[in-house]
Amino acid sequence: DHPAPALAAQAHYVIPELQTDDAWKSAKLIACPGCYPTSIQVPLVPLLRAGLLKPEPGRLIINSYSGVSGAGKKADVAFLFCERDGSIKAYGIPGHRHIAEIEEQFGVAAGQPVVVQFNPHLAPMHRGIATTIVVPAPGVTVAQVEAVWQKAYAGRPFVTLLKSGEFPDTAHVANTNRVSCSVVADARTGNLIITSVIDNLLKGAGGQAVQNLNLMMGWDESEGLR
């Protein structure tokens, strides 16, 4: 159960790069997205809005890898770095708590229900999220995807679009508010493979909150985040 359902009903859910108008800036309460959903929605929502992707239920497969800081600061042997070093493990499959958030926002973007297969993993790094998305998209080209991204993110300081065949690296976004994305097409399978990385503690959490505050106050969105 939500601890404050009355407040939840008033909140505006905001990834600033995905907002289509400025109405949210006058809101009293902003709900900042989760870390995994941010790494997933930034590359996919513009494509769903454009109608490029129409995945069948369960055919949109998302594998994400998070650093141990994603578990918070609770004292748990499983999350000690000495326990995780040299080891990767899946967790929360099926039914991770972020699935509802992801599917809700994808449904809004696509104008119809979208069912995802989300597979989170715990990786041996302090911070960062690496996401790989596999989606059937026969006939959709890399150029079409890149054109949608370029239109959606023109002038946005925290989105880096890499050339097809270049793959984002968590080390390149660590300690920043940036998200980096790329796409390749697999002609053999008819799938698009989209990759993205963020810092789970900044773009995936506190940094995005500061970015939202900056925009609400009419300040430069990168204030305090450069």
PLM ranges: what are they?
Residues D1-G86, Y91-I93, G111, V184-A187, ...:
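N-terminal Rossmann-like NAD(P) cofactor-binding subdomain of oxidoreductases
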Residues Q10-I15, Q19-T20, S69-A71, G95-I102, ...:
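Low-complexity, flexible helical/coil segments
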Residues P33, N63-S66, P124, N200-L202, ...:
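Short glycine- and Lys/Arg-enriched binding-loop motifs that mark or flank ligand-binding interfaces
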Residues T38, G139-V140, N200:
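A generic structural signal for alpha-helix starts
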Residues V42-P46, E101-Q105, Q144, Q208, ...:
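Alpha-helical scaffold segments in soluble metabolic enzymes
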Residues E56-S64, V68-I194:
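C-terminal substrate-binding/catalytic lobe of Rossmann-fold NAD(P)-dependent oxidoreductases
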Residues R178-R226:
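NAD(P)-dependent Rossmann-like dehydrogenase/reductase catalytic/cofactor-binding core
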